[in-house]
């Protein structure tokens, strides 16, 4: 994925919501209420319906750290599934292995979680994996590779995130054994992603 270097603080201010779910960005939004480059109301312009849809798509793209191609493919899969396409879209993104590593507190951020997976630190159902985009299913189990340095890193991350992040009910985390079991697919109200998924569906539907 070709990621342009965009400061996370600027992205948070651009969208007006803390898409990275980290306390420091809540403080930033309280301190700087205007998007970057805007100083007062005089420069605000009316956003078109397409513009609103694009903003919602970008929120999700940067929240989960996926490329345009990856997000398009996730939408196509979500549309093939039964149920509400928008809910399916977010549930698929939530069940990415890098996001599970993040939600479990094994990593400080999703970017850090991608590194952990890419470096082969995570074992999925007994096999080492290095692809952050793998989608997990119910009863899948991930665990930290048997190496002291890896375990020390993850235990440190769990300690740092334990007071900042609520563990989802749809995963079962064993902090002692350093493993996570997927219980089920999350429902929409269990996904804290701050985006209007219906607008994302409308965006892609017009381009299908």
UniProtKB/Swiss-Prot annotation:
Function: One of the primary rRNA binding proteins, it binds directly to 16S rRNA where it nucleates assembly of the body of the 30S subunit.
Any coiled-coil regions, as ranges: none
HAMAP family: Ribosomal_uS4_B
GO terms under cellular component: small ribosomal subunit
N-terminal signal peptide: none
Domain of life from the UniProt record: Bacteria
Annotated keywords: Ribonucleoprotein, Ribosomal protein, RNA-binding, rRNA-binding
GO biological process: ribosomal small subunit biogenesis; translation
Family, per entry: Belongs to the universal ribosomal protein uS4 family.
Assembly description: Part of the 30S ribosomal subunit. Contacts protein S5. The interaction surface between S4 and S5 is involved in control of translational fidelity.
Identification of the protein by name: Small ribosomal subunit protein uS4
